[in-house]
Structures are given as structure tokens and as C-alpha cells.
Design a protein with these regions (language model features):
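Pro/Thr/Ser/Gly-rich low-complexity, intrinsically disordered linker/stalk tracts
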Residues: 1-19, 54, 71-89
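Short beta-strand segments within Ig-like beta-sandwich modules, predominantly Fibronectin type-III
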Residues: 37-43
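Extracellular low-complexity, O-glycosylation-prone stalks/linkers
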Residues: 17-37
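Hydrophobic loop/turn residues within beta-sheet-rich immunoglobulin-like superfamily modules
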Residues: 17, 52-54, 133, 154
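Exported/periplasmic cell-wall-interacting domains
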Residues: 92-100, 104, 162, 167-168, ...
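Beta-strand-rich modules
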Residues: 49-70
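Beta-loop motif signature
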Residues: 22, 33, 87-145, 155-181
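Hydrophobic core positions of the immunoglobulin-like beta-sandwich fold
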Residues: 14, 47-50
Length: 301
């Protein structure tokens, strides 16, 4: 078992054990073990433990188990204990986020303004920047003047994307953010598709030690046909397909037919203009085709 740190969390990685049904993760303190996570998928090789305190060391161990015919569990021995200290991200890395959504208030509402530290009344139709399209409960949003507010999601109606591809995050901020995510790729490469910046970021290395080597501007899915978010991988590569050079990175997803990295098809890159795929310039796409192996992890966010 190996361990690496992030902000208020640690990531654990291990080699898959054949013939088992799952794993149990224990936090170790004062000589005692406390079960913190049970993993029932035997093919899983990593997990993240959150809710920790930055700057405070935490220790963990694990064991595998096998289910008998009568559902009883037979356990392996415990692994050796590993420790890591979560650390807060820098301001620049903390500022990295996914695509925002333009929204308006549905009615006249009272919200809490974090900047002013008091309640505030917003008129119906007030423009707000929201972090999500599907909103439940209370969320933190921004007014167009940059002030942060707390508002009930049901009081908002989203109507479009807010993105910014004119500028980009720094290399160091990208590496710090990605290395806090405990992302494990089957290859020595990792791809992060930044939907807010309309960028395909290519890293080389291994979990906890990813180094940015390329950043390509891209087109992303539109508000009505969004690019899937989450962790995927490169499933296939085609040189002369329906859309020319393609790398398939999603089976199914929001649009049901899978998504690829492919040619721009006569349109510019750097803004939402696809049906969920990532459109790239031909030279950038060919670099991906020639260098990125099948199985490479794709983090779309």
C-alpha cells in the first residue's frame, strides 16, 4: 500500500489481490484501528479518505477479504501502517474550478452576502454565477460584481455556460491541483480536460507525481449537449474514422453515443461548440494520437 496527500484528504493505492472480494481501510491512532472505508469491488486499486485536518499526520492500514459460500468473511493480515499529512492547496491551485453556469433569480429572494456579512435582497431576474446546472439545497454563488452569496438552488434558473479560454492557469497550479486528486492512470500519461479554460492538459509521471508536458486549446460540449464530467480513459484510437483522427475517451456518457477527441470540423477551438466531444486543432490531435496510449486516464472537469 502506498499513500499520498492532498488538501484535507489522503489517497491510498495498492496492488490488486487475486481471488478476493474486497478490501477494508482502517485509520490507525493510539495503537487502535478504526474501519473508515469498505470497498466491495475487487478490481479497485485506489481510494481517497477525506474529512482530515490539514497539517495533522494521519495513519492507515488495510486488509483484503474473501466471501465464503455462507457469506462469512475470511480476512488477510493487515498491511503495514502508512502515514501522510494533508496540506492545504495554494491560493492559485484552490482557484481552479470547472465550468460555471449563468443563472438568474426566479423571484425576489433574500440571500446571505458573505462579502458584506449580512442578508441582502435580490430582485427577480438578478444575474448570478452558479457552480452547477442542477442545483439542490443551499449553494454558494457569485454576483456579477464578484461578491459571494448563499442562495437556495430552487430560486435560480440556469441558462448558459460561463467559461474563459483567453487565459489559463499556471503550470505549477495545474500540477499542484492534479497531484492532490490521487489520480491513477494505467499508463505513464494522464489527461485533464479543463472545461472552464477549454484546455486539454497532458501530464506525464505517476500518481502524486504528475508533471505537465502539454496544454492544448479545445472546443467543449455546449450547454444543451455538455461534455461528460468525471474520470474516464482512452478506449480506442482511429486514424481515418467518421470524424478523421479520433481518440475515444467516453463510452456512453450524457449523450449516449460516446465522446472523442477529434478534429474541429471547420470551427474554431476555445469555446463550447460540440455535442460533448473535445474538438482540437489537427497538429495537437496528431500529437495526442502518436503519443497517448490506450488506457490513459482522462479527467474531465
Amino acid at each position: 500500500m502506498a499513500i499520498n496527500n492532498g488538501s484535507r484528504q489522503v489517497g491510498l493505492n495498492w496492488n490488486r489481490v487475486s481471488g478476493v472480494n474486497g478490501y477494508e481501510i482502517y485509520q490507525v491512532a493510539n495503537g487502535k484501528r478504526k474501519l473508515v472505508k469498505r470497498i466491495t469491488n475487487s478490481s479497485t486499486k485506489e481510494c481517497t479518505i477525506g474529512g482530515l485536518t490539514n497539517g495533522k499526520s494521519s495513519s492507515f492500514c488495510m486488509r483484503s477479504y474473501r466471501l465464503l459460500s455462507d457469506k462469512r468473511k475470511v480476512y488477510s493480515g493487515y498491511t503495514s501502517t502508512k502515514s501522510a499529512t494533508p496540506k492545504a492547496l495554494s491560493d492559485k491551485a484552490s482557484d481552479i474550478h470547472s465550468i460555471y453556469y449563468n443563472a438568474k433569480t426566479r423571484r425576489k429572494v433574500t440571500v446571505y452576502n458573505y462579502t458584506k456579512k449580512k442578508n441582502q435582497i435580490l430582485q427577480s431576474g438578478t444575474k448570478v454565477i452558479a457552480p452547477s446546472k442542477t442545483i439542490k439545497g443551499y449553494i454558494t454563488c457569485m454576483l456579477t460584481n464578484g461578491q459571494k452569496i448563499k442562495i437556495k438552488g430552487s430560486d435560480l434558473r440556469t441558462y448558459g455556460y460561463k467559461w474563459d479560454s483567453k487565459t489559463d492557469y499556471s503550470k505549477s497550479a495545474k500540477e499542484e491541483m492534479i497531484n492532490s486528486k490521487n489520480l491513477v492512470s494505467e499508463t505513464k500519461y494522464l489527461i485533464w480536460a479543463s472545461q472552464y479554460r477549454c484546455r486539454i492538459n497532458v501530464f506525464k509521471g505517476s500518481v502524486g507525481n504528475w508533471k505537465l508536458i502539454k496544454a492544448f486549446k479545445c472546443g467543449i460540449g455546449t450547454y444543451d449537449a455538455p461534455s461528460p464530467k468525471g474520470i474516464r480513459k482512452i478506449y480506442s484510437k482511429t486514424l481515418h474514422g467518421k470524424y478523421g483522427v479520433t481518440l475515444q475517451w467516453s463510452n456512453g456518457g450524457e449523450n449516449g453515443t460516446g465522446n472523442t477527441f477529434h478534429e474541429p470540423l471547420g470551427v474554431a477551438v476555445g469555446y463550447p461548440n460540440s455535442h460533448g466531444c473535445f474538438r482540437m486543432k489537427m497538429n495537437d490531435l496528431m500529437w495526442m494520437y502518436n503519443n497517448i496510449p490506450i488506457g490513459t486516464l482522462v479527467y474531465s472537469w
